């Protein structure tokens, strides 16, 4: 079972639907309706932290999940979840050069983790106004995906490889290989 943290965003249920289509049982909990102790007592194999229109300060329990469980259980941060991973490890979250909402972009990647066995580049849909600043990307994190102009679109913890983030939306119909990205995350649960 996957715990899907809902940061009060409608895209959460698109993620839940995609996971269900991959035959994954999903438990959705709002970011202020579950505690770390409750999470530790659940029988889950992984956690996905959903998007949100705000910044990491709006992510509720998500920061604690990354800080205290990121070395124990596979975690995938999507959009805000991705930014929150960067923030927790000391990265600066800044305004993107351009506001991007519902726009497909060319994304280059390293072919590892959630990007395993995907063509390179892929087209992915972006909905965000914030990004992890490249210059302040923490040493603990490696950049796994990027745009043509060098904006960070994917990260992975160097030591805890199961802690990954993607800035774009795999659940968007315009994202190429979105289900495969989620399947690749599921594959790392075993």
Swiss-Prot record:
Annotated residues for binding of L-glutamine: 52-54, 83, 129-130
Protein known as: Anthranilate synthase component 2
Active-site residues per Swiss-Prot or TrEMBL entry: 79, 169, 171
Organism encoding this protein: Cyanophora paradoxa
Sorted UniProt keywords: Amino-acid biosynthesis, Aromatic amino acid biosynthesis, Cyanelle, Glutamine amidotransferase, Lyase, Plastid, Tryptophan biosynthesis
InterPro entries xrefs: Anth_synth/Amidotransfase, Class_I_gatase-like, GATASE, TrpG/PapA_dom
GO BP, one annotated term: L-tryptophan biosynthetic process
Sequence ranges assigned to domain Glutamine amidotransferase type-1 in this UniProt record: 1-190
Record EC number: 4.1.3.27
Pathway: Amino-acid biosynthesis; L-tryptophan biosynthesis; L-tryptophan from chorismate: step 1/5
Top-rank lineage group of the source organism: Eukaryota
Gene Ontology cellular-component annotations: cyanelle; cytosol
Subunit composition and interactions: Tetramer of two components I and two components II.
Additional observations: Component I catalyzes the formation of anthranilate using ammonia rather than glutamine, whereas component II provides glutamine amidotransferase activity.
PANTHER family cross-referenced by the UniProt entry: MULTIFUNCTIONAL TRYPTOPHAN BIOSYNTHESIS PROTEIN, MULTIFUNCTIONAL TRYPTOPHAN BIOSYNTHESIS PROTEIN-RELATED
Entry keyword Amino-acid biosynthesis: yes
Catalysed reactions, semicolon-separated: chorismate + L-glutamine = anthranilate + pyruvate + L-glutamate + H(+)
């Amino acid at each position: 079972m996957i715990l899907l943290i809902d940061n009060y965003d409608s895209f959460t249920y698109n993620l839940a639907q995609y996971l269900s289509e991959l035959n994954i049982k999903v438990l959705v909990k709002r970011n202020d309706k579950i505690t770390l102790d409750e999470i530790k007592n659940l029988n889950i194999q992984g956690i996905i932290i959903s998007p949100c229109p705000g910044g990491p300060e709006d992510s509720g329990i998500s920061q604690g999940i990354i800080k205290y469980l990121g070395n124990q259980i596979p975690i995938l941060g999507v959009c805000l979840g991705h930014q929150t991973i960067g923030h927790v490890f000391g990265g600066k979250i800044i305004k993107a050069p351009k506001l991007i909402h519902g726009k497909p972009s060319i994304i280059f990647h390293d072919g590892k983790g959630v990007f395993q066995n995907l063509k390179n580049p892929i087209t992915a849909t972006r909905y965000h106004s914030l990004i992890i600043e490249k210059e302040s990307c923490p040493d603990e994190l490696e950049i796994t995906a990027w745009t043509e102009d060098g904006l960070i679109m994917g990260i992975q913890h160097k030591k805890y490889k199961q802690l990954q983030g993607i800035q774009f939306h795999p659940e968007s119909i315009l994202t190429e290989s979105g289900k495969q990205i989620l399947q690749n995350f599921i594959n790392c649960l075993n």
